[in-house]
Structures are given as C-alpha cells and as structure tokens.
Amino acid sequence: MKILMLGWELPPHNSGGLGVACFYMAKALAKAGADIDFVVPYSEKHDDINFMKVVNATDFPFSSYMNPYNSFTFSKHHTLTSDIRSVQLSYIEFIKKYLEDPKNRPDIIHAHDWLTMEAGIIAKNITGAPLISHIHATEFDRSGGGYGNPQVHDIEYKGITNSDKVFAVSKNTKDIILKEYKVDESKIEVVYNAIEPSSLATINDYDDRTFRYIEYLKTKGYTVVMTLTRFTVQKGLTYLLEAFARASQKNPKMALILVGDGEQRNELIEKTAELGISEKVFFTGFLRGERWRDAYSISDVFVMSSVNEPFGLTALEAAHFNNALIISKQSGVSEVLKNILRYDFWDTHKLASHLLAVSTSPSLLRDLKRGVKKEYTTITWSKIAEQIMHKFLSIQSEGRKK
C-alpha cells in the first residue's frame, strides 16, 4: 500500500511532539508493509531515514516560523504570518506538481494537522485517493481553551469535512472535534499516540554532572519535580507554579525543573518571583540529547499541567525514566494510563495535595514509579500501526464498493 504522508516536521528538525509522533508512526507503518512518501515543507535532508522516502517540498530552511504550535501568537493578530502562509502555499504547489507523475500517486493520503490539510484536499481531488486527516491538536487546544485563530479554524473545518476518515489522538480530542466542528461521529476514530521503548534504551546512561546543584539538593532530601513542554497558555504552567508554591510551603524540600521554552517564558520567570519560589524553580531552556535525558533521569515526579493536551508523549518518556506521573484530566495520555495521579488543570489545591503526597510518602512514590513503568511499555507504535493499517484497508475496501 502506497501512502502519501503530508507532515510538517521530522526529528531532528522539529519543534515539538508532532514530528516525533510522525516519525515513529511512519516507521511502524513501514514495518507493517506500507510504502511511504513523507513530504516536509523545508529543505533539510533526512539521509538517516531509510524506511520511507522523505521529500522536500520547498527550498526554505527549517525555522521557528514554521512552528505549528504558535497559533496563540497568531491569534492575537487574527491572521497567519506571511512567512508560514507562504510556506503553506509553496507546499500546496509542490504537491500539485509531485502528483503529475503517475508513480507518485498514492492509495491513501494521510495528512497531519491543519498545516497540511489544504494540500491533502488538493491531493485527494487530483488522485481520487481517500484522505485521512490525523488531528494531533485542534486550534481550540492550541489556544488553551480559547477560540484561537479563525483562519486556522476554517482550514481545520474544511480539512475535516473533506476527509474520508479523521484520526483523533484521544477521546478528548474526538469530543472537541464533535463539539466544535459538528461532524458525524462515525467519521472519527481514536488513534492514540505511543512510544517505542527501544528508541530510548540507547540513551539511558545518566550523567550526574549535568545538574550538579540539583544532585546536591537530592542529597539533602529534596524531591525533584519536572515538566518538559512548550511555554504556552495551553500548558497550564501558571497553575503548576501556584500549586508548587502552595505545596512547598508545607514541604520546603522540593525543587521544580521547567524544561522548554516559548512565548510565556518571561511571564513564568516573573511568576516564580511573585510567588517567592525563584530559588526552587530552575529554567533549563529547550534540551536535546543527553541533557534532555538527564533532566528526566534526575527527576522523581513528572507533572503534565495542560489546560488541554490532545495526547502528551512526554508523559510516556518520563515513565521510561522512572518518574511518577501527575497528569491533568484534560490530557489525552490520562486515558491510557492507570498508575498515575489525576486532577483538573484548574484545581491547584488538588495538584498541591498530590505534590505533597508523593514528596512525603516514599512508598507512594515508589509504587507509582513501578506501576507506570510496567504499564507504559504496552503502549507501542507497532500496535497503533496495526490499527491504522486495518483502517486503511477498510477505507480502501469501502471505496471499491462505491
């Protein structure tokens, strides 16, 4: 089966979890027998990828302006930046030309998120192949529960209504699509994200020199809490800071690591000062490779405080590195994990209570770590690929009957 996969990023040229999810999903689909052409909107090569053909749609270098997650910034102006729109339009023109060659014509078109939906619709019109839109996040998610950018809503609506099938990364995301875009429920299938434990096995060797001061705090009995995310309103980080401040009043031996960057960075730094917790909160910036590994490894507890998180792959990564998990109920990953503590994102009292519990009860912390570490290994991309391939075959079969 030949799949034309339309995406916006692949590691290492990625700004978030979308590229990671697309990479491992495509790898698992290729292993299941799919022949994939993956089209990216930038000029950087992916010569290390041998399980699919990566096609460069433009001569633009990968840049932060391609970030699909900055819609909150765009929404302030109620328009898309000229940079990102020009990349989109160039991407669409490339797809038109690419499909002129019969050998490039697919059996299935698989478009990831709003940035590639217009290209997906055009590819469907040219080839007659079924279009599957894979929703990793809606504009309502990206705007932190607000309305967001009307241009993006329009693209999402057209993409969803013109698709033969819609994959949503969680029940939570499916419910948002049903509520906001009023589509037939039978059109939407929940396809969870996953993790490939073997992909993390090669980076297990922790280097205790990376976070020496945090190591020192741990020798003094501190519990280390961390989150790894983009600093945007969607992620609920101000709620996390408020809860951490409340918890640390009762248990001063707590430290918080914030890994990532984004438009809220300065606001969050000011918030820590306002709450009087600056000496306990550590901003690392965006991390990759060994420093990324070490941030997970030094931590005891991982918090996902999102206002609305379609899935949340970082929670599975944290479980791999032996963290207990505290996850907002508004995060999709909470639908597939049992051995975690849950709370509503706005309930800072509940989150503070959870933080106190895990930081003062070694047995609870140990049990949560052990439970979720066993559990996360069953959530694999190979299982998700089987589900997707089965659905692709079903869609093909339905198309032949028409």
What are the language-model segments listed below?
Residues 340-349, 357-362:
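Conserved acidic donor-binding segment of nucleotide-sugar-dependent glycosyltransferases
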Residues 324-327:
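Short hydrophobic beta-strand element within catalytic cores of glycosyltransferases
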Residues 217-235, 241-244:
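Conserved donor-binding/catalytic core segment of Leloir-type glycosyltransferases
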Residues 286-287, 294-299:
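Short alpha-helical donor nucleotide-sugar binding micro-motif in glycosyltransferases
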Residues 28, 35-103:
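A conserved catalytic-core segment of Leloir-type glycosyltransferases
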Residues 172, 194:
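Carbohydrate-associated surface elements
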